[in-house]
């Protein structure tokens, strides 16, 4: 019984760790793109909030 309970746990953990490694390799690229887009979006939003009179036509 102990081995039967242990084996699926080991397999599932190995599967999860494999997914984490794959995600870890992809995350830096996504973070870099998102941070660049977020900064651009953040600056636009800040400009709208900081200078509403200039944006109102």
UniProtKB/Swiss-Prot annotation:
Subcellular location: Host nucleus; Host cytoplasm, Host cytosol
GO biological process, one term: symbiont-mediated suppression of host cytoplasmic pattern recognition receptor signaling pathway via inhibition of MAVS activity
Biased composition, class Polar residues, residue ranges: 1-17
Coiled coil: none
GO annotations of cellular component type: host cell cytosol; host cell nucleus; membrane
Feature: compositional bias, Basic and acidic residues: 18-34
InterPro entries attached to this UniProt entry: Flu_proapoptotic_PB1-F2
Major place of residence: host cell
Ribosomal protein is among the record's keywords: no
Sequence segments annotated as region (Disordered): 1-35
Alphabetical UniProt keywords: Host cytoplasm, Host nucleus
More details: Is not encoded in all strains, and seems to be dispensable for replication.
Family from the record: Belongs to the influenza viruses PB1-F2 family.
Protein role: May play an important role in promoting lung pathology in both primary viral infection and secondary bacterial infection.
Name of the protein in question: Protein PB1-F2
Annotated source species: Influenza A virus (strain A/China:Nanchang/11/1996 H1N1)
Gene label: PB1
């Amino acid at each position: 019984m102990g081995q039967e309970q242990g084996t699926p746990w080991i397999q599932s953990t190995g599967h999860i760790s494999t997914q984490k490694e794959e995600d870890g390799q992809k995350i830096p690229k996504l973070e870099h793109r998102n941070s660049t887009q977020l900064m651009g979006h953040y600056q636009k939003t800040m400009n709208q909030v900081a200078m509403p009179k200039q944006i109102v036509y």
